[in-house]
A protein has these predicted regions:
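Generic alpha-helical secondary structure signal
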Residues: 49, 73-76, 116-123
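N-terminal/domain-start segments enriched in small and hydrophobic, helix-friendly residues
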Residues: 1-5, 75-76, 126-134
Length: 137
């Protein structure tokens, strides 16, 4: 089964979910993308610095991650799409993402850029990923 995690910039939430899912799941594969990967947060850049450091402290190397812009094909190719949202993104999301029939929404509030807030979001995402792995393998 292919799981696609999506967030705005593919620098923290969706990237973290992808890395944790791929570490925990033995049968399934995850990837991630952002629906607004443009400008200085552009495609091909790595994860946020704080996120990289937090993962490194936990024994995970995410330095090879490169931000990717979400495409309709990515959604078509996925069996499950998980939007790791920070709030009400529904008004700015592509229609084809919402109407795919594959999309689940995990709301992980907060856009603060402190180490403590990043760590708290990673803990929440980690719990949600564990639940998904327990559900699908």
């Amino acid at each position: 089964m292919k799981v696609l995690f999506v967030c705005k910039g593919n620098a923290e939430r969706s990237m973290a979910a992808e890395a944790l899912f791929n570490k925990l799941s033995k049968r399934n594969k995850a990837s991630s993308a952002g629906y607004d990967v443009i400008g200085e947060k552009g495609e091909g850049k790595g994860p946020s610095e704080i996120t990289s450091k937090l993962f490194e402290e936990r024994g995970h190397d995410v330095s090879a991650h490169k931000r990717r812009h979400l495409t309709e094909r990515m959604v078509r190719d996925a069996d499950i799409v998980v939007l790791v949202a920070s709030g009400d993104e529904s008004r700015i999301l592509p229609k084809w993402l919402i109407e795919s029939g594959k999309t689940r929404v995990w709301t992980v509030h907060g856009n603060e850029h402190t180490r403590e807030h990043h760590a708290a979001r990673l803990e929440i995402i980690g719990g949600l990923v564990k639940d998904l792995v327990n559900e699908i393998g």
